[in-house]
Regions:
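Extended recognition/assembly regions associated with phosphoester-bond processing machinery
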Residues: 1-244
Length: 244
């Protein structure tokens, strides 16, 4: 689903901004394992990068990539097993903690972050949280025990993170924010604080995201449907349409 959606955006000349945790480096010790499992995705991202249409934000699960030395080592090139040579991948790609969009003709800037900045365990104590994920929570997930510190798996933590983000928005002149981290898609009503969340790309049957077209924001979902002839098709649905 992710590859199909990303290819669609590439063909339509979109710019892709990844809001963090795009590369799972907590549960996976070695990037090469991630690359081999998602090679087609990375090669498609390379096409975006070559056209200067790829921008990356680091989250808690790929926070090590905030180091340019680390991101260069992991992402600049890959080993092609067919030719037996190293080939360029995402050479020179920089990971940012946040990005500010300043659209022409729009009366407000838009702050893009992962969102773990409002999550003490996953921002300040991220190394400790990563250790626990690797040695404790990952094995326990096999028997159905979820990580209580993860907002994506603990509803109470999710609400706390959202509350902190909204408090920050209110304290900063209703700064518009688009975040991730919680895996819960959010799209505010006109009278609510301008907090958006793009949801998640890890669910097996659907992925969600935020689209900005002609200064208008939509919450969208790519998912699989079953057609009458028994075939499956990936389609895009608009969950929340732009509002004035």
């Amino acid at each position: 689903i992710y590859y199909h959606a990303l290819r669609n955006y590439y063909e339509k000349d979109f710019t892709y901004i990844e809001l963090g945790d795009g590369i799972e480096l907590w549960e996976n010790l070695f990037f090469n394992e991630v690359f081999e499992a998602h090679k087609n995705d990375f090669l498609l991202m390379r096409k975006f990068h070559l056209k200067n249409r790829l921008h990356m934000i680091w989250g808690n699960h790929d926070m090590t990539l905030k180091s340019e030395k680390k991101s260069t080592k992991l992402l600049d090139s890959y080993f092609d097993k067919i030719t037996g040579t190293d080939k360029d991948l995402l050479k020179g790609l920089i990971f940012n903690e946040g990005i500010v969009l300043e659209p022409e003709g729009f009366n407000k800037n838009i702050l893009l972050i992962h969102g773990h900045q409002a999550d003490f365990y996953n921002y300040v104590w991220w190394k400790w949280s990563r250790f626990l994920v690797r040695v404790l929570w990952k094995p326990l997930q096999v028997v159905g025990i979820k990580d209580p510190t993860s907002p994506a798996k603990n509803f109470k933590e999710l609400i706390k993170v959202e509350r902190r983000l909204k408090k920050w928005i209110l304290a900063n002149n209703n700064q518009m924010v688009i975040a991730g981290h919680t895996h819960r898609p959010r799209f505010p009503e006109p009278n609510e604080l301008p907090y958006f969340n793009d949801g998640s790309c890890v669910h097996p049957r659907s992925i969600t995201g935020i689209e900005i077209v002609d200064l208008k924001i939509s919450l969208i979902k790519w998912h699989i449907i079953s057609k009458k002839d028994g075939t499956l098709q990936i389609v895009k649905s608009v969950l929340e349409e732009p509002r004035d």
